């Protein structure tokens, strides 16, 4: 079994080989069950951004909005009017933030490539959303710790 520290629960026990495809080997943590790759398979920041630059997600795309409704609707149903939110990993065409703004919420966005403003982490929010982001992070534990610190007590973190 390969030795690797789980990037989510930080377990340093042996991980189980989960899957191999034509590009990389995947491991699974014995404790939290996270499936991850070892650092040797990480993309450089330039490679990662180049891939994201090919995404065609837009707030005007009804199919993309329908896809995001799986996260938007359950969160929206639990919010008080005029709640404040953060869309973490908003991408080149922020859409979740637009959807929440359309129904009266105040939104901040963060994306390390397209909206890299770390001052958004100086605030506390009623809700935080992150869609198609966490699975791309090299250190998801650090991201979750940061997001939890930015949430007001008892508030919502929506991950898709």
Q: PLM features: residue spans?
A:
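Conserved N-terminal segment of class I S-adenosyl-L-methionine
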Residues: 1-127, 131, 144, 160
């Amino acid at each position: 079994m390969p030795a690797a520290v789980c990037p989510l629960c930080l377990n340093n026990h042996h991980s189980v080989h989960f899957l191999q495809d034509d590009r990389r080997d995947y491991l699974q943590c014995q404790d939290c069950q996270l499936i991850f790759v070892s650092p040797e398979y990480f993309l450089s920041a330039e490679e990662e951004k180049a891939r994201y630059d090919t995404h065609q997600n837009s707030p005007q795309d009804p199919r993309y909005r329908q896809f995001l409704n799986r996260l938007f609707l359950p969160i929206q149903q639990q919010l008080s009017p005029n709640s404040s939110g953060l869309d973490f990993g908003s991408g080149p065409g922020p859409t979740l933030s637009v959807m929440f703004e359309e129904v009266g919420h105040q939104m901040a966005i963060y994306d390390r490539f397209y909206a890299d403003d770390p001052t958004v982490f100086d605030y506390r929010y009623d809700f935080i959303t992150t869609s198609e982001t966490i699975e791309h992070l090299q250190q998801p534990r650090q991201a979750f710790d940061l997001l939890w610190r930015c949430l007001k007590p008892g508030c919502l973190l929506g991950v898709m």
